[in-house]
């Protein structure tokens, strides 16, 4: 795997987190372990009708691949969007999307995350699965400025939070999206199209709680053609359940609502590249 820092530097965060790694068996069953060993995440591809067991190391504070990850992978595989393409995974976490893109035939895969633990986890997971991936640490598109990609994948933090102040807790930063859930989403919409190659595509997954129609509108304003490609309704997870009362008070969900709709939004760049309006 190509990487921008030494193996020892990349792996250092895993050494400190070695006694708190989780073992994940599917989306809803989690067991704790004090041994450093890979997590096991099960992703079901509806496009192929098969279940692929993928072992992913997940240190504390790194986002655990979940239903939103699976939905985005399903869309990517069903559309054949990764095969033969240069792929960028923004906010890679454990590297689940980067791995899926490589397995789906991408010619080159780049992964970016601000978290050093996420970068370390992605580096190790790609080594485990013998996948070639260039890994960068940095803020969204900053490490790959000036480059162009045929496919950009993003599963950003999108859960509405009590404040726009960045949480001191590492794990909260995996899902906190600011007061309206769009702190990172809006940046993806404005900055992402500029990194798309002609005829390139960006796929973003997020909850309808932060309004997929706003995402479509912002992407269209950035000079690409946006549409919702897929939807899936799932029960609230632990974070959404804890914040349900706050979301109800803000009118973001209906009283008593305890499920959410996930949406995958596609942004299509024209043959000449994005056109700024």
Where are the model-predicted features located?
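A short acidic, Gly/Pro-enriched loop at the edge of an enzyme's catalytic core
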Residues: 141-152
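Short hydrophobic alpha-helical segments enriched in small aliphatic residues
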Residues: 10, 16-17, 28
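Mobile active-site "lid"/loop adjacent to the S-adenosyl-L-methionine
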Residues: 156-184
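Conserved Class I SAM-dependent methyltransferase catalytic core
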Residues: 182-240
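Conserved SAM-binding motif I beta-strand of class I
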Residues: 108-113
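Conserved SAM-binding strand-loop segment of SAM-dependent methyltransferases
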Residues: 130-140
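SAM-dependent Rossmann-like transferase core, predominantly class I methyltransferases
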Residues: 38, 42-104, 115, 121, ...
